[in-house]
């Protein structure tokens, strides 16, 4: 089954370039993971003809996972960096990326929620969750 979103859509939405360290393989893996999580939760009719909100939700969830991956790498890097069109200071890179990822993840889950099956698990759609 084909993913609902694409690498191009994730890169465009989050303004992520190849030079940011986000490889095609990384983004495609995050898209596949987001897709698997969404398909396991939404109603069958939404799988065959996904509403725009589900497509955008998948883009946001895949982008959030990509930002978290980049954030983990950048947390170890001491250089100044420019990511998603913003200059990020050395001490703020990791928190800024994680904050952006969390907001995207929450919005993606909110967009997908109306299309979930009534029997969907109560766990969040989030690809990565913070420890509680």
For each of these PLM feature ranges, what is it?
Residues 65-132:
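Short loop/turn elements at secondary-structure junctions
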Residues 32-39, 59, 63-67, 71:
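Amphipathic alpha-helical core segments of compact helical bundles
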